[in-house]
Amino acid sequence: MGIRKYRPMTPGTRQRSGADFAEVTKSKPEKKLTKYVHRKQGRNNQGVITSRFRGGGHKRLYRFIDFKRDKRGIPAEVLAIEYDPNRNARIALVQYTDGEKRYILHPVGLKVGARISAGEDAPIELGCALPLEKLPLGSNVHNIELLPGRGGQMARAAGAVAQLMAKEGDYATLRLPSGEVRVVRKECYATLGQVGNLDAKNISIGKAGRQRWLGKRPHNRGVVMNAVDHPHGGGEGKSPIGGKPQTPWGKSALGTKTRKRRKPSSKFIIRRRKTASGRG
């Protein structure tokens, strides 16, 4: 994938860049693998805003992605590489020898016509899914299960890759894209390779309207609100916060850990992810 620069014909295109879609080989999705999903606009089932600054955006068809890779021992061929509006990564359409078609995340280097498979006896090749206990140390993997049979939950975004660092007893140690080091059961499946579309993080939006196409509404700061709306609000003119940074609901912000202190899975985290302040 490459980055396409736009000529500065208007203020909106002056700083704009986008993907060149060079790896995409098919424009229309597989109809049986799509579904229209009503967009929640950041509301819950009572219509109350639970996630601010969301709404609008272009209509999307949801593509059903095979995160479980549960067709074990059946080879598949890559038919096409497609664009998915629901994620930054590209997706690959594969067809198994029994005729079934599925979508999977497209790893870097996987070409149309390549053959992949999943299972304990699958080859150690790009795009194949195997249990962690069958993979050699140092392998780069993505779409990693947290619990056996649940389906991949970690390292699924564009450019994401985790590394298998150790295998000891019933557990395997992984270094995740965030820098976190954690252990998971060796029976958990992972897919070999790095998720494609590496330059997704380097794209410049260019104008506010393009954010609206993505369903993102303007994010206004608390310091410009009224005192009734935010702890940072109020005052005459440009006034400071007058205290420690807080969320709209009065909780401490900027650097405060938000993970539950007694979460059972914390015992599987060997080293926490890196933070902006440098504290793990």
From Swiss-Prot:
Give one GO biological process term.
Answer: cytoplasmic translation
Is-annotated flag, keyword Amino-acid biosynthesis?
no
Region: Disordered, residue numbers = 1-25, 230-280
| Chain intervals with Basic residues compositional bias | 257-280
Pfam families, A to Z = Ribosomal_L2, Ribosomal_L2_C
Give any Gene Ontology cellular component: large ribosomal subunit
The molecular function terms in GO held by this entry are: RNA binding; rRNA binding; structural constituent of ribosome; transferase activity
Q: InterPro entries attached here? A: NA-bd_OB-fold, Rib_uL2_dom2, Ribosomal_uL2, Ribosomal_uL2_bac/org-type, Ribosomal_uL2_C, Ribosomal_uL2_CS, Ribosomal_uL2_dom3, Ribosomal_uL2_RNA-bd_dom
The alphabetical list of record keywords is: Ribonucleoprotein, Ribosomal protein, RNA-binding, rRNA-binding
What HAMAP family does this protein map onto?
A: Ribosomal_uL2_B
Q: What does the similarity note say?
A: Belongs to the universal ribosomal protein uL2 family.
Its quaternary organisation is: Part of the 50S ribosomal subunit. Forms a bridge to the 30S subunit in the 70S ribosome.
Its function, per the record, reads: One of the primary rRNA binding proteins. Required for association of the 30S and 50S subunits to form the 70S ribosome, for tRNA binding and peptide bond formation. It has been suggested to have peptidyltransferase activity; this is somewhat controversial. Makes several contacts with the 16S rRNA in the 70S ribosome.
Name recorded for this polypeptide? Large ribosomal subunit protein uL2
